[in-house]
């Protein structure tokens, strides 16, 4: 692929179908001369994106508002609704939309403030510095705003080093401030209030012990004595669930066998009825075909009977299998089944629960050379893994009991597939590059002729910007925003994590890796696949004199192309991507489909009102419903069929987890936001214009997501607090983005800095100091320990862990007839 063109220019699809019949392109005298045009025609891309933004906002104002609010609001009503969205507090978001939504908006708002602070400095200081103090010879105006306008080894680069230090300081304190505000959302509502009864959680008193023997379910006296002796008078309750994973598979298999028996019996009974072809006349083509079909059926039945494959034999085997499965099910009903290898220990106060976790972690770190007693060996004490228990509503209870080997095999398969995709098909454009290479093998002259035409099209302003910047970025945006996140989410579900938050963290890490490779590394290297980049980098080691790849990456032309490519993607994502989310077309389409189904015979209840005007809500209004309906376990297949009579404002609850299903994919949006954050941070020193665009992205998205949470994704049933493990991962990745920024500046200063390499050395020192800065990793805010003293102040009724770990067999109506 020729890289002498626009940085965002992708391998053209049309060039694969062009043959030698092309006429020569226009002569050079016919081409317009654009000596001072912006590199890559960014002004045209910006105009196209603004037009798309205005179209989406118009559709929102004149179409979407009617769908969200039942009728078109007037100007005053519209202003009041938007003002209510702006004034909605974190506590209201957490109470009505859940803690995940509150944390998501806190991180978005904090990212906006952080990037806005950097943008003010970048636009007011670094942009004029690059534009007016630079002396490097560049051909376009946009490149003059970048760091490439400053000559190699210039003393002005020390100002860029000072800017790097300021950016790191702002990022550190900004991320720390976000983390401090997020502390209050752990197990509590948005402001850390304990007054909300739905925010109270028994998880702060509970620890989870993994690695227990599975035969502990029937005899757990020794296990309980181990904790009672270690913490006398402090243990409140032990919950040792059965192997619910095996029970889930058993129930599914039993239902399938019963269905097959019912179908087979009905099939055998149908043979006693008169043949359906007896009423057919004695002549004609239909009679001949029916007679032939009857003879074939008779012949086939004789063959299967001779080999022992009769329906009677199949029915006998199915009945034996059903009897065996029912005997296994009886063991679960009587409490004789094996355990899941997991136990929940609930203490009477938070201090003892935290102390128990620390004690077992310290014992695990000093386990080398330690001897265990016979009782401890019988309990497999050396394999215990003790940690704070996740929320009961966060656990996939049907995954309890899955063996460690099965988990490892599943994760190895998923990570291997992901690694192969990242290397060989990391970008959707890799397929286009492969097709272009194949086309050059078959007809190279046609592609060369097409290349001249492409050169002419690129100089045509609007057309070139539309084809080589707008459409490729839209293509990347759609594939990275819709197709790939869905595939990675399914891969994360295949891993069968123990908790919903664990599954979200796995999906988040996969998406972030995929986005970093595609939207940062490959776009920075102007490559279509990671395989191609690795092959070209390897030549530096095979032929060092002929290859200076690192210096080429830091050359003015290459760095300018990379910066413009990042800026083009940021503009497209900001103006078009967020405007697409403002319309929220997928929930709107589902709502329309539901309206068409409202007259279905399966819907036996009237449609409920879905309008939730924030300004009309009173604190006493019934906005929350119980997480578990009484008929949750009515059928082992409840999670496969969504009840038609369910209100759209309530998420359906599956049998796999008592937490409502999330229609807003937090992992996907976190991953995309983190990619934009990383893209903005990495290019903040190279191209100061990138920073205000990134700040506008987070500010615009904060407003749009806040509206969608309150009027589109506003649901019942989500707890107002959680343990915050997902946001810990997000904050860790944000700090890693700062590391990437320092590494990129370290590479730049090592190539383009002063001759003594002092700038590179000092940047390395800043990186080391930043990694040594302390971060608050404690998951519990001190106010939480002071506000909650004993478990008795929280528990009012059955313990949630105990209720969820006991399976309900009401679905087994076969033996209750």
From Swiss-Prot:
Transmembrane intervals: 42-62, 109-129, 155-175, 412-432, 463-483, 506-526, 569-589, 676-696, 729-749
The UniProt keyword set, sorted, is:
Calcium, Ion channel, Ion transport, Membrane, Transmembrane, Transmembrane helix, Transport
| Knockout mutant characteristics | Accumulated 12S globulin precursors in seeds.
**Keyword Cytoplasm on this protein?**
no
May I have one GO cellular component term? membrane
Location(s), subcellular: Membrane
Q: Kindly give the InterPro entries that the UniProt entry links to this protein.
A: Csc1-like, CSC1/OSCA1-like_7TM, CSC1/OSCA1-like_cyt, Csc1/OSCA1-like_N
Q: How does it sit in the bilayer?
A: Multi-pass membrane protein
- A Pfam short name: PHM7_cyt
Q: Which GO terms describe its molecular function?
A: calcium-activated cation channel activity
Q: Which GO terms describe its biological process?
A: protein targeting to vacuole
Instruction: Write out the similarity annotation.
Output: Belongs to the CSC1 (TC 1.A.17) family.
Give the protein's biological function: Acts as an osmosensitive calcium-permeable cation channel.
State the protein's name: Hyperosmolality-gated Ca2+ permeable channel 4.1
Organism, as annotated: Arabidopsis thaliana
């Amino acid at each position: 692929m020729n890289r002498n063109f626009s940085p965002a220019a992708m391998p053209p699809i049309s060039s694969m179908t062009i043959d030698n019949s092309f006429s020569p392109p226009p002569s050079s005298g016919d081409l317009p001369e654009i000596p001072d045009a912006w590199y890559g025609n960014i002004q045209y891309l910006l105009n196209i994106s603004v037009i798309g933004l205005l179209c989406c906002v118009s559709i929102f104002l004149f179409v979407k508002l009617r769908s969200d609010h039942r009728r078109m609001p007037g100007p005053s009503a519209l202003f009041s609704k938007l003002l209510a969205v702006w004034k909605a507090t974190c506590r209201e978001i957490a109470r009505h939309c859940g803690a995940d939504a509150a944390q998501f908006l806190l991180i978005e708002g904090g990212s906006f403030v952080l990037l806005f602070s950097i943008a003010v400095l970048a636009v007011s200081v670094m942009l004029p510095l690059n534009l007016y103090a630079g002396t490097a010879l560049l051909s376009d105006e946009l490149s003059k705003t970048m760091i490439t306008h400053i000559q190699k080894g210039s003393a002005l680069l020390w100002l860029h080093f000072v800017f790097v230090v300021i950016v790191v300081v702002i990022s550190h304190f900004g991320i720390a401030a976000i983390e401090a505000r997020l502390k209050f959302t752990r197990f509590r509502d948005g402001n850390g209030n304990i007054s909300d009864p739905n925010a109270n959680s028994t998880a702060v008193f509970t620890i989870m012990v993994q690695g227990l023997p599975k035969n502990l379910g029937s005899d757990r006296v020794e296990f309980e004595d181990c904790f009672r002796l270690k913490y006398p008078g402090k243990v409140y309750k032990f919950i040792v669930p059965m192997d619910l994973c095996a029970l889930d598979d058993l129930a599914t298999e039993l239902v399938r066998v019963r269905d097959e028996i019912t179908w087979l019996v009905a099939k055998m009974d149908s043979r006693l009825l008169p043949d359906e072809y007896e009423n057919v006349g004695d002549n004609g083509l239909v009679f001949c075909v029916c007679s032939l079909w009857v003879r074939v059926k008779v012949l086939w039945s004789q063959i299967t009977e001779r080999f022992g494959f009769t329906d009677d034999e199949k029915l006998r085997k199915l009945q034996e299998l059903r009897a065996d499965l029912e005997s296994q099910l009886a063991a679960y009903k009587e409490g004789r089944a094996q355990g899941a290898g997991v136990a929940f220990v609930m203490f009477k106060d938070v201090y003892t629960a935290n102390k128990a976790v620390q004690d077992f972690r310290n014992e695990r770190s000093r386990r080398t050379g330690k001897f265990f007693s016979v009782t401890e060996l019988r309990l497999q004490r050396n394999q215990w893994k003790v940690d704070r228990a996740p929320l009961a509503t966060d656990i996939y209870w049907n995954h309890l009991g899955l063996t460690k080997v099965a988990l490892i095999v599943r994760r190895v398969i998923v990570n291997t597939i992901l690694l192969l995709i990242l290397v060989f098909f990391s970008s959707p454009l890799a397929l286009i590059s492969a097709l272009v290479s194949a086309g050059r093998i078959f007809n190279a002259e046609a592609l060369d002729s097409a290349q001249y035409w492409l050169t002419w099209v690129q100089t045509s302003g609007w057309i070139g910007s539309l084809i080589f910047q707008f459409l490729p970025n839209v293509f990347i945006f759609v594939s990275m925003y819709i197709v790939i996140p869905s595939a990675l989410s399914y891969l994360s579900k295949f891993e069968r994590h123990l908790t919903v938050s664990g599954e979200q963290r796995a999906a988040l890490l996969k998406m972030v890796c995929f986005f970093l490779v595609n939207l940062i590394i490959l776009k920075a290297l102007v490559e279509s696949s990671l395989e191609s980049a690795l092959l070209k980098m390897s030549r530096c080691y095979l032929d060092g004199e002929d290859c200076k790849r690192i210096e080429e990456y830091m050359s003015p032309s290459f760095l300018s192309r990379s910066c413009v490519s990042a800026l083009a993607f940021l503009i497209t994502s900001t103006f078009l991507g967020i405007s697409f989310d403002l319309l929220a077309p997928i929930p709107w389409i589902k709502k329309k489909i539901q309206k068409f189904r409202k007259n279905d015979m399966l819907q036996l209840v009237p449609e409920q009102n879905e309008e939730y005007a924030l300004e009309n809500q009173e604190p006493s209004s019934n906005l929350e419903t119980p997480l578990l309906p009484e008929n949750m376990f009515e059928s082992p297949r409840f999670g496969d069929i969504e009840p038609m009579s369910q209100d759209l404002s309530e998420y359906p609850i599956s049998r796999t987890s008592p937490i409502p299903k999330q229609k807003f994919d937090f992992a996907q949006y976190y991953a995309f936001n983190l990619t934009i954050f990383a893209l903005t941070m990495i290019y903040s020193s190279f191209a100061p214009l990138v920073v205000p665009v990134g700040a506008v992205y987070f500010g615009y998205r904060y407003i749009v997501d806040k509206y969608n949470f309150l009027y589109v994704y506003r649901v019942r049933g989500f707890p107002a607090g959680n343990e915050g493990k997902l946001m810990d991962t997000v904050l860790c990745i944000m700090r890693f983005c700062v590391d990437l920024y320092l590494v990129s500046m370290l590479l730049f200063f090592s190539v383009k800095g002063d001759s003594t390499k002092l700038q590179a050395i000092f940047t390395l020192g800043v990186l080391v100091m930043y990694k040594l800065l302390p971060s608050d990793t404690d998951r519990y805010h001190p106010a939480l320990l002071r506000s909650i003293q004993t478990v008795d102040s929280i528990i009012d009724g059955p313990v949630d862990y105990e209720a969820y770990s006991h399976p309900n067999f009401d679905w087994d109506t076969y033996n209750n007839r």
